Amino acid sequence: MGILTKILLAIFVISSFTFIALFGRLPAFRRTPIGYLSRLFCDRIPRWLYRVDYRLFGGRISKALGHLGHYLFFKRNPVVMLIFLTILTGSSFMFLRAGYTRLSALQLFPVPFVLLAPYLFTYLCATNRSMYITPANHDDRLHDYPYDHILYRPNAVCKTCHLSKPARSKHCSLCGHCVAKCDHHCPWVNNCLGKDNYHYFLALLLSLGVLEIYGANLAWSIIRPMINWNFNTIGINCFHLIWWAKMTAVTVDAAHRGGISITGVGLLAATTAPLPLGLLAYHIYLIWAGMTTNENQKWSYWREDMADGTVFRARRSDVLAHNELMRNQISTNQLEGGHLQKRVSYLNDESEQGEPDVDWPVSSDQMIVRTNDGRPPLGREYLYERIWDLTQVENIYDLGFVDNLRDVFLPR
């Protein structure tokens, strides 16, 4: 196996596993080969290995790996971030040491800025703690966003933090805190991404993509004069087998002349650049849609339930008026019945009691519920209509792309 084959194979394996690890669990890939590979690598193969270990070694290896896996995947730790920074630092050092003297001053001028930017934004993402919800800032976080009464409802209490959950927040078991406007926990920065550091994460993705593209371009500028890159003389294009044979020969020649430090790093940069840029494009889509990663997953569950015909919509003001009327009609002696007691408790859950008054440009009177039997809530059938698609639901957090961007980069 030649050096080119080894480089390409290593890059392909790293890129493929990274892509599957990052995107395999997304709802969009649930019924695709990527989702299947994610379940294969993360669920089925580990279960098969556990059975083999249990029969041969009594499960001792699985137990030891389980403790290690619990630390790596269920405890906040810097392992993934250190691997990421090690690859970034090692690749940059190898390339600059071998190619520094072959680059012009104009090419070298942007290097300090392009190279240091990912380190800066990684630091800002990893060290920011202001999005953690604590008793000291809890009241302020309650007034960040209004409750939409779909994904977020008032008076819900975190069982771990023992604080009422602000709208758009989520508890992170790895960080041990509820996180304001939680997007997701990112092992690459060993921290949750939320209200006050999400924009740094976007900058990290952009800076990393720019670094890889620029690094690949520098590697190509060094290798280009060393190889015979003349495809026009044979009058072919990439749809001919001859073109691919020529490309293979050129790549092999480049690998031998540039070595791992230049050709290898350049290929690694060129082939992995789509990963951060693709993830950045996905997050730009989320911003355009007025969602976080956490909310996108929640909406996907609602979408599936709507397709099953088990979701109903009503005007919240009508439901509250109906509940108030029911409470007024039920006398004290009737409350002693178990069924009516449950009904009154349910009515109280739907009240607006304790909901903070939030200054937000969009408001909605909608309320949606899901039922197990596919029928509207008992006794209130006339208030609810069945809905089949998310287009029938208003997302109050979507203010339009420009205002959504402003909310990300200039949070209130």
Q: What kind of feature is each model-predicted range?
A:
Residues M1-H171, C182-H185, V189-R412:
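Membrane-associated feature with strongest affinity for ZDHHC
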Residues S173-H177:
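Secreted, short cysteine-rich peptides and small extracellular cysteine-rich domains stabilized by multiple disulfide
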